[in-house]
Amino acid sequence: HLMWLGAYLPDLGLITGFLYGMRDREMFLNLLEIPSGGRLLYNYVKIGGVKRDLPPGFAAKAERVMQTLERRLKEYEDLYDNSKIFRMRTDDVGCYSASDAINWGITGPNLRSAGVAFDLRQADSYDAYPELDFTPVTTSASDGISDCFSRYRQRIDEMYQSMDIVRQALAKMPEGKVMAGSIPVRAKGEAFRRTEDSRGEALMYLVGDGTDRPYR
């Protein structure tokens, strides 16, 4: 969402907004590099677990980063929500209805910005999300209408919610092994899975040939 915001603002004539977004995104790239060793391609999650355990002090570092972002988000809100130029270029611009969004196959924050409370993390209840307390964030310019401003607000609100989800997950993180002892080889077949991504639904398709290496 920070990358989206940083790329979006220069299109509205707010050039410094790009620098603010990239500055704050960098904090999270640094944080994610700690357990994974990578800055953009993390390869941290593996079949059966994760590459390595979180190092001591990681939760405290994550909390400091999130507290900084919370302060910065309030600055963003003061800067953009109250900007006449920003509002002129986003209010009632690029409008579509909730029914349009559904019919067009729009997913993720652009769907929820039309007031549709659909989030795969709850709808499909995968991974540890059933153990976390959250509901889909929604916004809309008016009843069931999305515009450029509501899509901006949707992402701001989702960043606040994401930090709450991360805090819950870190607090509930169990002790113990980070990889399963053995991973059973699956029979030949195929599987399809969808997950919630920052841009909407992410789709995965896997074909197995009966070995421990997927065919595709």
Protein language model regions, located:
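Active-site bordering "gate/hinge" segments
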Residues: H1-R216
